[in-house]
Amino acid sequence: LVGKAVRFVLWALVAGLWALPVPLAASQRVQLVRVGLLAGRPEVVLSADAPLRVLDVQADRQEQLSTGAWAFRAATGGIEVPGVARYGPVVRVSAEGDRPVRVEDRLRAYRGVVELRRTEAGLTVVNEVDLESYLYGVIKLEINPAWPAEAVKAQAVAARTLAVASLGRFAREGYDVRDTTDSQLYGGVTFEDPRATAAVDATRGLVLLHGGQPILAVYHADSGGRTESSEHVWGRAYPYLRGVEDPYVSGSPYERWTLSLPTGQLEEVLRRAGLPAREVRSVEVAETSESGRALRLRFSGPEGAWELSGHRLRTLLGPDVLRSTLFTVRVEGAAVVFEGRGWGHGVGMSQWGARGMALRGWDFVRILQHYYTAVQVGARP
């Protein structure tokens, strides 16, 4: 941090109550985040409710376009607004008065700067925005902002931490994070919500730290009763991503679910994975983790038996199809039937569990320290 050390005060000096960090002052160094929105586009239409300022980075020249919608096209060696202007390979577009810039192709408006980059594939669109404003556009898409405020605050801290830990992840593509589940869902100003904004502001600058560094604060919808240790999903054991009991989930629509999949569809998926699955006659869970999730599945048919990890199967089927790897499975006639619990990879914070804890009076620090082992809530480095 620049200047004075960040100060903390105790929310209470009574045994059993939690020490709540004070949100950071506005003087803290501003962290910019570059969010990849689109790639490979021949044309991108930008607009605003104010004149647009267009900075040609190569020429170091700024021009102004009147209020309205303008089409930016990929041209040889650069970018053009047909019949109006021609620029180098990178332009940075903002609006007078710091008004949001709309990317018509996404039907969304964004704070900060919208950057267009000419690549071999076309135009890449990047939103460069300060970290806290980025979070304004994340929270509503990742959690219900009508939930108890402490759960939404916990989400804000987890999302901020994950964003900081992910800076530079897609540097080769010209940005830090994507606006999809590859990173975190992000909808710009269009998806801001006053309750989400309040949660971000109430926790401004606070992140989860292990060894003084921001952690990989992944999260998911519903653990199904127990979270998972990271090595069982991504092959690497993080000391702060350990499986824990998650007993306070209530009212989740994902608590129990059933998926019936035609055997032919499953066989096609397995063949795409390189397995000789001409005919599947039986399926069983061959190994589970401590949380009960399927680590290995064994399939058998006329060609013999073969195995696939539960995580790999979920990836192949799609995470919205096979909601989690916490399931039992059987062949029933011409279908393979999965009966499971929860939704998501199961690592880190369970959002429905956080909601249940908040309903019981837990504050956001206590919620976070339940899901992330041996972490501190403190100032962003």
Locate predicted features.
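Conserved, single-site charged/polar hotspot
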Residues: 5-13, 19-381
